[in-house]
Amino acid sequence: MTKSLLRTIAAAGALAAASFTGAAQAAEAKLGALSFLPNHTAFGKPFADWVGKINGESKGSIQIEIKAPGSMSPFTMGNAVKSGVIDMVHLPHTFYQNLLPIGDAMKLNQKTPKELRANGFIDFMNKLHNEKVNAEYLGHWGLNIPFHIYLRNKKIETADLKGLKLRITPVYRAFFRALGADLIQIPPADVYTALERGTVDGLGWPQWDIKSFGWDKQIKYRVDPGFYGTSEAFLVNLDKWKTLDSKQQAYLKKSFQDMEDEMWEKAKELNAFYAKRQAEAGIQTITFSPEETARYKKVAYEAGWEEALKLDPVNGPKMKELIGGKY
């Protein structure tokens, strides 16, 4: 074999090795992500833990970087993932209601994650997200974490909220209005001061994590039972999703399903933990008679569905068929 031929073979081998290395590097998918709450909070931690698991398990196939909290308002994250400014977002459905109004109806869900996967709901939601949000819908978690009414110092005997000024979000706007409350919408950062000054008499919030915001120092009562359920969605920009190969896509979907089922069970324990924590902070529970409790829940779901069906009369009935139940 001539020296010239050897040099040619060596050069070809080097080129092939370089090409292989480049292909291997290109195969690793890197995604930038944003969460609606910081990683250390009760609602931010499950997402951060899931990302950590992905980065550790995927062996260089997928790497997700959570961008600094506060770098973008949660209410603009839906538009950001739609346009591709960010690859992945973790946020409640109500925060991108401008893009997908019916998404907020997830609060009314009465099915388990496994039931929703089996009855075609995930496919239904994914199609809507593909069309309206330019996103792949991995799923959601938090559906069995209830919301409650928290009151500063006014104890109520019935589900009559007339004369009470309550801080709201779109999640429970229709419900609180149906019970006669005066509605006030302010950012979470302003809630402590509003409670302290009496600008609001209370607010709606999930059972988790009022302590992180210091609200437990201002709140004396929690109304039981809870109503609705939180719903935190995981979305991936659709154009970015299509750059992933089939194995990467399947891995992300399976990993999220595992997390979804795990958090469904874990939430049951954490609901009890946070209820105990609130009691230790001196927060008392308000309970109604069985008849009043039944009316309270009936109004919650009827008001919620009435609003949802008005927002999207086309997709609303199908949504109700897939996630609805008897309170």
Task: Enumerate the language-model features and the residues they cover.
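Hydrophobic helical h-region of N-terminal Sec-dependent signal peptides
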Residues: 10-15, 20
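Bacterial N-terminal signal peptides that target proteins for export
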Residues: 1-10
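Sec/Tat signal peptide C-region and signal peptidase I cleavage site
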Residues: 20-26
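N-terminal secretory/targeting leader peptides
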Residues: 11-13, 26-111, 115, 121, ...
